Amino acid sequence: MGKVVEISINKFSYADKIILENVNFTVEKGEAIVIAGLSGSGKTTLIRLLNGLIPQVYEGKLTGEIKILGKSTGEYKAGELAKYIGNVFQNPDDQFFSNEVENEIALVGENTGLERSVLLERVNSAMEQLDIVSLKGRKLRELSGGQKQKVAIASTLVYDSDIIILDEPTANLDFTSIEDMRRVLKKLKGQGKTIIIAEHRLFYLKDIIDRLIFLKAGHLENIFLPEDLNESIRKENMLRCFDYSELTSEAAEAGEEVLVRVNDLSVKNKSYKLDDLAEFSLAGGECMAVIGENGIGKTTMAKELMGLLPIKRGEVSYAISDRERLRYTAASLQNCRNMFFYETVEKELIPREKEADREYLDKVKKYLIHLELWDKRTMNPHDLSGGEKQRLALLISMLKKSKLVILDEPTAGLDYKRMSLVSSIIEEKAKEVPVILITHDLELLFKVCNTAYLMSEKGHRKICVTGNESEIIRFFNSKDKQ
């Protein structure tokens, strides 16, 4: 078949910090591999070395060589690798330069000088291959996360890239979009494309990949075949689960005393015109998952509960006005960058009136150490990594005295270890006040949630998690939510 990627890294470092060392492997034409490992293991750096972002965008010192299609990456001119490698980032918005779908898909072809007639033909072909013809004429900002990822992949097909590199492409996707991604990747592999994916979520890849490259602390720790990926290997290497059907509830039962009531709350939004009313109660010790497809009203409901949106209809028991709801709820938002207002992590967590409160300061220190943020405490929050920002946003909500906690996708893009750290903090908080958890992360749900609120076009309902694991998994997987 022939080698299309040859990696021989003796050492790669940023300044004096070694990031990768003794990483050597090859990728055959038409092969699909996943690069896995805990955050900080070197996955993103390796991806940047492969697609040429290092050294063209990011500086660093490489001892060794990386070859793409038999040619050292250092021999390619700036931008030339884009002819052969298609890139799909974790957040597709980071790679978009156009406002409309067709213009974005055509961009690589325009930049590489394709004739207009050929370019138009390839744009149409790419959209047909990915079943996104219906998106013609749409604005990118109007699309869902899954649709945006398909547009990003379509742009790689316009120049007929031999190699497609994806960096955590499902971190922000719901189950329906992940299944779409799985079908797209399987189709591309069937066309002979070489696929390299850096990913934490593995359940959708097991029947696609040929090998799993496992990095640990910058070293190539192991290479696994799909048949090697059993539960023992998963636990030993702290990998995300391979099969959701094997998950069972681990959460303790909620208490009996009702602390929060939500009555006849309207969650109608621009996407869904149906005005199905939300109604539920929350007891002490309860962590309730809120699940449903994107656009169904989960975030609208959360914003109403926390006072960011006015309640159009209905009432809640813990507050009357928008201002009171803001005061009595603690929240961690999906776009947590908007939650930071101070110049250091410490100042985000320690209000002026708490600076002399030794008990509070000890609690902050305990949480910072537990969430692996202690050595980041003097940094600007905006300089943290994505996962570190998520954990800081979670910690802000955990420390606030409140009557209700609302968490929106607190583990998106987190590895198994950090997901487990986050879950233990959520469990601890749920013992104090009820927690509402909006999530597409089934592993987290089964670890911490004792109830689930299922939202769909056919109505909303609340169920216990224990004993209903199969029903919840079916609900996640179903496009037509029951």
Model regions: which residues?
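Conserved ABC ATPase signature
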Residues: 139-143, 147, 380-384, 388
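H-loop/switch region of ABC-family ATPase nucleotide-binding domains
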Residues: 199-200, 439-440
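ABC ATPase C-loop
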Residues: 157, 397-398
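Conserved beta-strand-loop-alpha-helix hinge in the C-terminal portion
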Residues: 219-241, 459-481
